[in-house]
């Protein structure tokens, strides 16, 4: 055991751990979610990148020596490479605007650096968590900057599964291009379309959301490093701000810049609201698609039954043979959670006061949670559902030609009133539109066959009105 102290008192710390007294206090104070910082390696990596960039700037400004720089950068590189992440034990939701997270990072880096230099953990006179690792920084600029860097990476990582889902829908659109089916509005028969057209819209929806995700990265490119406590830059070198911008770009390989006004950037959480809004948009639209898939596959004998979803597991403990659409159902629920997380982000952003928003920890937690579950849900939907969907072509075809909805195709030829009369009689007599129109000699068989050709009902085409 080793003894560490702060201005509150002292505590015993295990010699096996790399965190220190402030981390231990925080872990005891904030047992809230049991979801710890180590659950989000992208945040640990981005925070280590901030610390490394700051160290590189500090040594160039003569604020720390070369020996410390080498040791601290070595420690940061270990964390960036995914090592020692189990040392990050603070709860994601915490009081203090993220100070506990920042100090967990400072203490682990300091003790790794001490070990590298041949010292014992806790010998902070040689490398101090605050004086050296946190030099030229405050939690109030380090935490949000690390968070934005992590969000940038999570946005980038979300693109690949979204592209896979888009491509899966596009492939189904090609497979189903020849399958005519009934389009529906307000759950009522409308006009014909193809199943391929239906799936093509899903592919396009995802493609447009990919554009939104890529654009959202621009909202988190502005950092507030160098602002320190409230954005005025107190305790930082006059040249630190311009230098840290270059160093963070070098360390991350990403186009991050410092905000023009660091005071505004320190208190603003608008970028998080925008990013969360994009995730909510994806969730809302994805949930709607899952609603469609569940409805289109309903049955199999007393529902629409136009498509078949892959059979994943038995669906009932009491009804033999029942199979449920479990994959769309789980994605629906993920989407509900993401939408709820967005509300939490909005409330936390609104709750800020004066020069700092202390609620960034819950913003970070909800955003990371949304990224994780949404990414997994998209992958699950792609591989366990969409790729295995098949069409019930005969059912789709029969729905069209037994439907009242195809009467719409007669409108340009015989007018609305005659078409409505035919529809009314078809409903009353339970006969087809085609048979009634032919029986009443409103149109010839040749004319009806031409009008009801699938290709003439699926897209705009030239026509001429038939005489009475």
Curated annotation (Swiss-Prot):
Residues 315-324 are annotated as: SS loop. One of its GO terms (biological process) is aspartate metabolic process. One of its GO terms (cellular component) is cytosol. Signal peptide: none annotated. The active site is at 316 (proton acceptor). L-aspartate binds at residues 99, 138-140, 185, 317, 322. Homotetramer. Belongs to the class-II fumarase/aspartase family. Aspartase subfamily. NCBIfam families: aspA (TIGR00839), PRK12273.1 (NF008909). This is Aspartate ammonia-lyase. It comes from Helicobacter pylori (strain ATCC 700392 / 26695) (Campylobacter pylori). The lineage of its organism: Bacteria, Pseudomonadati, Campylobacterota, Epsilonproteobacteria, Campylobacterales.
């Amino acid at each position: 055991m080793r003894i560490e102290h702060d201005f509150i008192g002292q505590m015993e710390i295990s010699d096996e751990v790399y965190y220190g007294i402030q981390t231990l206090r925080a872990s005891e104070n904030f047992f809230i979610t049991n979801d710890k910082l180590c659950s989000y390696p992208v945040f640990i990596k981005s925070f280590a990148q901030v610390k490394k960039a700051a160290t590189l700037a500090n040594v160039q400004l003569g604020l720390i020596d070369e020996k410390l720089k080498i040791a601290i950068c070595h420690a940061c590189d270990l964390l960036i490479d995914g090592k020692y992440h189990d040392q990050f034990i603070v709860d994601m939701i915490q009081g203090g605007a993220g100070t506990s997270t920042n100090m967990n990072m400072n203490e682990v880096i300091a003790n790794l650096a001490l070990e590298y230099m041949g010292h014992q953990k806790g010998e902070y006179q040689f490398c101090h968590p605050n004086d050296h690792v946190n030099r030229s920084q405050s939690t109030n600029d380090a935490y949000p900057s690390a968070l934005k860097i992590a969000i940038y990476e999570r946005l980038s990582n979300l693109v690949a599964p979204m592209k896979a889902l888009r491509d899966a829908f596009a492939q189904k659109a090609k497979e189903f291009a020849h399958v005519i089916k009934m389009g529906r509005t307000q759950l009522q028969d409308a006009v014909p379309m193809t199943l391929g057209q239906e799936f093509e819209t899903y592919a396009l929806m995802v493609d447009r959301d990919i554009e939104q995700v890529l654009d959202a990265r621009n909202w988190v490119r502005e950092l507030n490093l160098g602002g320190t406590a409230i954005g005025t830059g107190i305790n930082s070198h006059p040249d630190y701000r311009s230098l840290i911008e270059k160093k963070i770009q070098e360390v991350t390989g990403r186009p991050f810049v410092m905000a023009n006004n660091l005071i505004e950037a320190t208190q603003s959480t608008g970028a998080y609201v925008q990013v969360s809004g994009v995730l909510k948009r994806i969730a809302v639209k994805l949930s709607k698609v899952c609603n469609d898939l569940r409805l289109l596959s309903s049955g199999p004998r007393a529902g629409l039954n136009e498509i078949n979803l892959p059979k994943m597991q038995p669906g009932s403990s009491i009804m033999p043979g029942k199979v449920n659409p479990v994959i769309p159902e789980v994605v629906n629920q993920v989407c509900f959670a993401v939408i709820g997380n967005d509300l939490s982000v909005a409330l936390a952003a609104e709750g800020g006061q004066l020069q700092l928003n202390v609620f960034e920890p819950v913003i970070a937690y909800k955003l990371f949670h949304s990224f994780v579950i949404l990414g997994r849900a998209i992958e699950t939907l792609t591989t366990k559902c969409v790729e295995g969907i098949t069409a019930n072509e005969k059912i789709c075809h029969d729905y069209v030609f037994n439907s009242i909805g195809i009467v719409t195709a007669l409108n340009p030829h015989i007018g609305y009133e005659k078409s409505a009369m035919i529809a009314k009689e078809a409903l009353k007599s339970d006969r087809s539109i085609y048979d009634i129109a032919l029986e009443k000699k409103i149109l010839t068989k040749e004319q009806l066959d031409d009008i009801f050709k699938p290709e003439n009902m699926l897209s705009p085409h030239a026509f001429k009105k038939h005489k009475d």
